Regions:
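N-terminal loops that bind phosphate or other acidic moieties
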Residues: 1-144
Length: 144
């Protein structure tokens, strides 16, 4: 089973994990949340993400879901992926940015897949979960 770590700005990661607990009735096995508070030293953030990755690792890989590309949570997670075996985590790591609830639900539901397949399904789930609701054509407005 692929481990999943949610890394996001405080309190997004915990809120996402709370939603998963609500949807599944329990906190899903091998899923952890790491909230990154403002002004935390990036070394401290990295250490917490690494500990969470160790906690979910079964040898099948770790998928890290982050909220915003280029922000501290994504940068910290990307460092873990870039270090590879040098991090001490003896498993592949994949980082995805743009976390949303459909992405998380897809990940949890398909954790039996391999890491790369799970990452692909997560991206599909996240993209498919972004929809425009309501009328297909914008309502005409009159400007005066």
């Amino acid at each position: 089973m692929v481990g999943i770590v949610i890394v996001a700005h405080t309190p997004v990661a915990s809120a996402m994990l709370g939603f998963a607990e609500h949807a599944f009735g329990v906190v899903p096995e091998r899923v952890r949340a790491v909230d990154i508070p403002p002004y935390e030293d990036t070394k401290a953030s990295f250490d917490r993400v690494l500990r969470a990755a160790y906690g979910v690792n079964t040898g099948q890989g770790v998928l890290i879901l982050t909220d915003v590309m280029g922000a501290t949570p994504a940068n910290v997670a990307s460092k873990l992926e870039a270090l590879g075996p040098l991090s001490g985590l003896d498993t592949p790591v994949v980082v995805l940015a743009g976390l949303n609830l459909p992405m998380l639900m897809r990940c949890i539901s398909h954790r039996g897949e391999g890491l790369e397949e799970l990452a692909h399904k997560a991206l599909q789930g996240g993209q498919n979960g972004i929809l425009r609701l309501g009328s297909k054509t914008p309502q005409a407005t009159s400007e005066k």
